[in-house]
């Protein structure tokens, strides 16, 4: 199934049913009182988190969703039937955003969680509601209120405990294959991974955690280059990040330079994401002699001024991976215990999570806006500065012929 993590849809709640104007008419009762019933309320639209879904592909081609309208009121004080609510099932981890205001309506992070995104219209009133001591035969009714209509943007962020960072061909997919039952595609060319992959890592049989692999980052990713920038948001909800570095790149490049590129791009994408717990994992150690391996490890650590945990592994040979997974499991459990017992720590992490979410959304929105400007041919702020510099080189052409470009 195709992986889709961003869609835009329009939802419309049902309108309320109209009130009825009716009077009681029976044998021997010629002038009975009013008995027009109220209309029914319109159906509302809800989002429901479904743990059996992992993509938003169902909403890629079906963009309009409308709940049922409430039935009109009837005679003999019959109230119209309420419109049926519409339940849209989405994967756990979906964020619902109002497209017009960019307001976050809610996050669906637990299975079965419901979120109302459009309120059904209020029912209209029948003429029975307007009778009084001075108005025995009212002919007044009210129509049902229209239901809410909203343009929504839905963003899916996979829920994983551990996220993998690294350049293409750093061995992220090989690592996730070696520690879990996931089987992502592995090849000797860049960008083998095109969509996020999830794997469940079992530790000591009864313990497990989820690990996420996203497409590799390249230099300039924070400006929209490559694939990884669109998927960095999936790491926003992870508990710990593993920064994978290839110790023996095929092109002979410096592992320290590659590690520095990832740090720079991560900082530009979301400064708060760099405050997340990160571990340095140096991969493909089996391809080097011991002296050369130790020298490259030292170079990377010194270049990054790294003070956190460092692991030297070989994912394909499964060297050092078991110790790494056990340490990850221990960290995740200790973190959960501290969250439960330390309110200050829990508040600090909640604030960090919110800052990461806000920065990631702002960065991706800026990239979307820039892409829209390019498609429409409108210059962005950065492009205007470049054109002004270009015009300065041709100030001597003021006396030349004037050329006017007209867009069809």
Swiss-Prot record:
Residues 1-159 form the Obg domain. Keywords: Cytoplasm, GTP-binding, Hydrolase, Magnesium, Metal-binding, Nucleotide-binding. Pfam families: GTP1_OBG, MMR_HSR1. Its main location: cytoplasm. The keyword Metal-binding applies. Belongs to the TRAFAC class OBG-HflX-like GTPase superfamily. OBG GTPase family. Residues 127-149, 378-408 are annotated as: Disordered. Its cofactor is Mg(2+). Residues 385-401 have a biased composition (Acidic residues). One of its GO terms (molecular function) is magnesium ion binding. It comes from the Bacteria. It is found in: Cytoplasm. The lineage of its organism: Bacteria, Pseudomonadati, Pseudomonadota, Gammaproteobacteria, Pseudomonadales. Its EC number is 3.6.5.-. Monomer. GO terms for cellular component: cytoplasm. PROSITE patterns: G_OBG (PS51710), GTP1_OBG (PS00905), OBG (PS51883). NCBIfam families: Obg_CgtA (TIGR02729), PRK12297.1 (NF008955), PRK12299.1 (NF008956). This is GTPase Obg. One of its GO terms (biological process) is ribosome biogenesis. An essential GTPase which binds GTP, GDP and possibly (p)ppGpp with moderate affinity, with high nucleotide exchange rates and a fairly low GTP hydrolysis rate. Plays a role in control of the cell cycle, stress response, ribosome biogenesis and in those bacteria that undergo differentiation, in morphogenesis control. InterPro entries: G_OBG (IPR031167), GTP-bd (IPR006073), GTP-bd_Obg/CgtA (IPR014100), GTP1-OBG_CS (IPR006074), GTP1_OBG_dom (IPR006169), GTP1_OBG_dom_sf (IPR036726), OBG_GTPase (IPR045086), P-loop_NTPase (IPR027417). It comes from Pseudomonas putida (strain W619). Mg(2+) binds at residues 173, 193. Residues 160-333 form the OBG-type G domain. GTP binds at residues 166-173, 191-195, 213-216, 283-286, 314-316. Residues 129-143 have a biased composition (Polar residues).
């Amino acid at each position: 199934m195709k992986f889709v993590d961003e869609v835009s849809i329009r939802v419309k709640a049902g309108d309320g049913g109209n009130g009825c104007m009716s009077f009681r008419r029976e044998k021997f009762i010629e002038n009975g009182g009013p008995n027009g019933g109220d209309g029914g309320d319109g159906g509302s639209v809800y989002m429901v988190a479904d743990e059996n879904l992992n993509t938003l592909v169902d909403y890629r081609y079906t963009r309009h969703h409308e709940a049922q309208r409430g039935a009109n009121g009837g005679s003999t004080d019959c109230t119209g039937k309420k419109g049926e609510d519409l339940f849209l099932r989405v994967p756990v981890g979906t964020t619902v955003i109002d497209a017009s205001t960019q307001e976050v309506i809610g996050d669906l992070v637990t299975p079965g969680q419901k979120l109302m995104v459009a309120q059904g219209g209020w029912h209209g009133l029948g003429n029975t509601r307007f009778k009084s001591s001075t108005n025995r035969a009212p002919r007044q009714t009210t129509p049902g209120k229209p239901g809410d209509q909203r343009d929504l943007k839905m963003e899916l962020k996979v829920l994983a405990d551990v996220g993998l960072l690294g350049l293409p061909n750093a061995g992220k997919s090989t690592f996730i294959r070696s520690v879990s039952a996931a089987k992502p595609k592995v090849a000797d060319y860049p960008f083998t991974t095109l969509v996020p992959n999830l794997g469940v890592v079992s530790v000591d049989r009864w313990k497990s955690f989820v690990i996420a692999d996203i497409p590799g980052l390249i230099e300039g990713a924070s400006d929209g280059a490559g694939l990884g920038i669109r998927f960095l948001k999936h790491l926003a909800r992870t508990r710990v990040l593993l920064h994978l570095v290839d110790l023996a790149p095929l092109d002979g490049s410096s592992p320290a330079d590659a590690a520095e590129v990832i740090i720079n791009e991560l900082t530009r994408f979301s400064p708060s994401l760099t405050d997340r717990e990160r571990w340095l994992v140096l991969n493909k150690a089996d391809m080097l002699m011991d002296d050369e391996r130790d020298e490259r490890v030292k170079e990377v650590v010194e270049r990054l001024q790294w003070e956190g945990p460092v692991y030297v592994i070989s994912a394909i040979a499964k060297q050092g991976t078991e110790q790494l997974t056990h340490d990850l499991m221990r960290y995740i459990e200790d973190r959960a215990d501290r969250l439960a017992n330390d309110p200050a720590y829990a508040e600090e992490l909640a604030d960090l999570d919110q800052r990461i979410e806000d920065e990631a959304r702002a960065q991706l929105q800026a990239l979307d806006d820039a892409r829209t400007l390019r498609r429409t041919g409108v210059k962005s702020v950065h492009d205007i500065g470049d054109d002004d510099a270009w015009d300065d080189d041709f100030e001597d052409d003021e006396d030349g012929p004037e050329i006017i470009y007209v867009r069809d």
